[in-house]
């Protein structure tokens, strides 16, 4: 005997309710992770903030790390949009200018979205790899790599034009990212800035110029031309 037919529209309403509940949980998780940090945040905290049971959380997310992965993807979406705008693919820009624009877009992102920046710096610690479903983990990995590819493209452009002496643009993009990240993380505390006696922007720009000098195919020529420009101004 056939079961009673589900009323028209019931299935769609349930799906909308599930989607809303999931968004409510993510919103609560965002508040918890932003205020306490990824390391100290717990599923219990998220459940309390969302005003649902702990079991309800697990109906929508496999683990705390899975929630973190979704928040990381939110941050990567914002960062990717800002990097694309900085790269300006439709504009005819020198490779060096593109690298500078990308670097400063990254610095701006860290200041305008500090909570997302901190999640991006900390998300792969602990048991993130083991506790995030494989498809979700791969999405985070691929989207992270996609952001870095803007830098790689700028370096490839510089190599093609003869401006940069770069054997492996992909590897050098990683070097640039790691170096600038180091500066940003080091000075993400007022005491460290006080110890070094240098504000973040100054040290960031000095590091970027040092890296660009190392990439330059003709560093002596560029340095002398910059010196002449400075003398003429």
How would you name each of these model-derived features?
Residues 112-135, 185-189:
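Amphipathic alpha-helical segments used for helix-helix packing
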